[in-house]
Amino acid sequence: MTAALEEGNVYALADYYFMNGSAYACVDMDEMMTVYYERTRRLLQNTGWWKEYEQGLYYNMGATYLAVGRYEEALDCLNRVRSEDFLLCHKKAWLHLLLGNTREADHYFAIMKQLLSRKDMKGKMAERLMYEELCMEQKPDFTADPAYLDLIERLIRALIKEKSFGFLYQYKNVILEAYTRQRKYKKALEFSEQISTKTRKSTL
């Protein structure tokens, strides 16, 4: 950061802000995320570099606002993302379920199902389990279902293997709820400690 300020290197400074914003987004620290992403946006908005950051910035903001319950802001950010890939459709389906917009959620479930049928998605177990998990969330009292616990543990393993920590972090609350409701208290404690340790490392 010091070198960027001394040299007046706008791109390097914006990249520093973006990385900080992304680190806070990874652990759902929405206020700090917003501070750094807004700095990124202000620096780059009128430059040719903005397109390089814009889509990732709005996706991360939308996903984080979704995680902390700021649903209208989440929808606004996610609607600014142009490419309808699996992860965006997953977040939009999840958000519309929480908002009670069944028709809109079904639209994105259909797109996810279609995307998962493509050859290039064949080996992506994390995405398949994310889709199955969200389908199960539509059922009443799903965290008390032993089948859900089995699914979420398979998802945990897939996310650890295939994705960054932020993907696992987004499920922390529902995982802990499932463990607690099904009296898996030791597993709940172990998972909570694992998340806490990685969160501290992510924000150092």
Please give the residue ranges for each predicted region.
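Residue signature of alpha-solenoid helical repeat architecture, marking inter-repeat boundaries
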Residues: Y11, K51-E52, S83, K122-A126, ...
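Structural motif corresponding to the intra-repeat A-B loop/turn of tetratricopeptide repeats
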Residues: E7, V27, V68, L99, ...
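Residue register of alpha-helical TPR repeats
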Residues: D15, G56, L87, W94, ...
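Structural register within alpha-helical repeat arrays
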Residues: L13, N20, M61, K92, ...
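Amphipathic alpha-helical segments of tetratricopeptide repeats
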Residues: M1-E6, E38-N46, D76-E84, A110-D120, ...
